[in-house]
Structure formats: C-alpha cells, structure tokens
A protein has these predicted regions:
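Ribonuclease/tRNase effector modules and their secretory precursors
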Residues: 1-95
C-alpha cells in the first residue's frame, strides 16, 4: 500500500503511467467487469483513458484513496494496490 496518499495529481498521473508501462492493472470483480459490460467499454478503452486522461483529486472511500481519470467521454476510477499495481474500481461513459 502507498503510505503517502493522497497523492498529488502529478504523482498520481506519473504512477498510473509507470504502472501501465511495467506494472499490473487488475479489475474489481464483479463490479468493474459489470460496469464495463453495462457501458459497452473494453479494457483497451480503460487503458486509453488511463494513458491520456486527466486525473482528479483523490477521494477517500471505503477505506482507500480513489482517483478518477477522465476524458470528455469516459471516466475510470482507480485505486493503487501498491507502487506497481492499480485496480480499476469502476468505469462509465459520460452522457
């Protein structure tokens, strides 16, 4: 677990990119998987949002810090499991 959360926006974005490059991305089961189906999103859509989206301030919810990463069309919520693993908690299409 990352001990110095909440991360600054630049730190969160850098860590997300580093994890995408050399870490592991996991999906909350069953919630994230259900949301991807509901909103007709793919894992590639989520990775693309994580690569190029903006990061919002962290929010503390259900015992962990969560970060919204968003584009005008899609929002993905992540939490950091460790310095080299993030979990996609949920995702949706902006309407």
């Amino acid at each position: 677990m990352i001990l110095d959360e909440p991360l600054k926006l630049t730190q969160a974005k850098s860590l997300i990119r580093e994890i995408l490059k050399s870490g592991e991305v996991i999906y909350s089961k069953p919630h994230a998987e259900e949301r991807l189906r509901k909103w007709n999103l793919t894992t590639v859509d989520c990775v693309n949002v994580l690569r190029g989206g903006a990061v919002a301030e962290g929010e503390y919810e259900n015992g962990s810090w969560r970060y919204k990463v968003y584009t005008p069309r899609i929002c993905v919520v992540v939490r950091f499991e460790s310095d080299n693993m993030l979990q996609i908690v949920t995702a949706w299409r902006e309407t």
